[in-house]
Amino acid sequence: MTAPFVLAVPSKGRLQENAEAFFARAGLALSKPGGARDYRGTIAGLDNVEVAYLSASEIAANLARGSVHFGVTGEDLLRESIADADQRVLMIDGLGFGYANVVVAVPQAWIDVRTMADLDDVTTGFRAQHNRRMRVATKYINLTRGFFAAHNVVDYRIVESAGATEGAPAVGTAEMIVDITTTGATLAANGLKVLDDGVMLRSQANLVAARDADWSDEARETARVILDHIAARARASKYKEVRTRFKGCNDALLAEAHKRFGVVSPFGGPTSSGMLTLHCPPAQIYGLGSFLRDHGADTVSVASLDYVLDKDNPLFSKLAAFLRQ
C-alpha cells in the first residue's frame, strides 16, 4: 500500500479555523470522518491525503523530521526549532493569518533605552554594577541568541519562560523579555515597550514543505494538485472578470487598458466581433468600466472569479526546485 501524503494543520483555536477556511476557499475542504474530536482527517477527492491535526510546535517538529509532507505553522516556530530551517523546510507561501512579531521588550521606565545599541550599554553597565548578567525571559531561546549576537549584545542570560512571559519583569524573574506580539497592547499593559530596532522576526502562518519527507512520484503529484488549487484561488482573488463587446474594441485600446488599469487579457485580444474578456484588479474596476464605455461599450459586466487555473504553477515550481537542491 502506498504511504499517504500527510498534511499537518493546527489542532485547535483560531489557527485551526483559519487553516480550514484557507483550504476550503481553495476547493480543498478538510473533514473529520471520525467526528470533531478526531485528530485525523481527509480531503474530499484526494483519497491518498491524510490530514494530521497537531499543535503548532508539533507541526514544526514533524516537518523537521520529515514525517509529514506539508504543514501549516508559524515561521517563528520554524526558525526557533530548526537550526538550519532554510535547508530542511521550504516556506511555500504565507497564508495571510497568524500574524505575530517576535520582539525585544524592556520596561517603559527605561526611558534612555530605545535601541539594541542602548541595550548593549545598559547590560554592560548592569553587569559591572551588580556582578551578574541581565536576565531575558523568553520561549525563543535560539532566536534570541542569534539576534543578540548580531547586535553584539553579550552581557545577558536567558531565563526560559514557561508561562506568561510579559509578566516576568513585573514579578522580578527577568529584567526584559523576548516574546511574540500582534498589537503590542499586552506588552504596554505590563509596562513594557518594544525597542525601535527590536523586531526580530515578522511571522505569519505558512504552508511549509519538509525536505526529508518521502517524496515519491505519487507524493509529488499530490503536492502539485494541492498547490494547483491554492495557486488558482490566489490568482482569482487578485482580479474581477470584466466582459464587454463593441466595434471600437481593438488591440490599441487593449494596450492602453493594460497600461492604465493593470488588466490581464487571459484569452488574448478582442475577437472579430469585438468581444473582450479582461481580468482587472478590484480597485481599478470602476475606472476600467468608465474607460470602456467612453470608447464605445454599451455594457460592461463584472463578475467574481472562483479559480484561475494557469499552465504554470509558481508554487509547485518552487517546491520542485527546493527538492532538487
From Swiss-Prot:
Cellular component terms (Gene Ontology): cytoplasm
Enzyme class per UniProt: transferase
Localisation: Cytoplasm
GO molecular function, one term: ATP phosphoribosyltransferase activity
Activation and inhibition: Feedback inhibited by histidine.
UniProt xrefs under InterPro entries: ATP-PRT_HisG_long, ATP_PRibTrfase_cat, ATP_PRibTrfase_CS, ATP_PRibTrfase_HisG
GO BP: L-histidine biosynthetic process
Span of the signal peptide: none
Keywords: Amino-acid biosynthesis, ATP-binding, Cytoplasm, Glycosyltransferase, Histidine biosynthesis, Magnesium, Metal-binding, Nucleotide-binding, Transferase
Pathway the protein acts in: Amino-acid biosynthesis; L-histidine biosynthesis; L-histidine from 5-phospho-alpha-D-ribose 1-diphosphate: step 1/9
Swiss-Prot/TrEMBL catalytic activity: 1-(5-phospho-beta-D-ribosyl)-ATP + diphosphate = 5-phospho-alpha-D-ribose 1-diphosphate + ATP
Highest taxon, organism lineage: Bacteria
Family of this protein: Belongs to the ATP phosphoribosyltransferase family. Long subfamily.
Protein name: ATP phosphoribosyltransferase
Record organism: Rhodopseudomonas palustris (strain BisB5)
Name of the gene: hisG
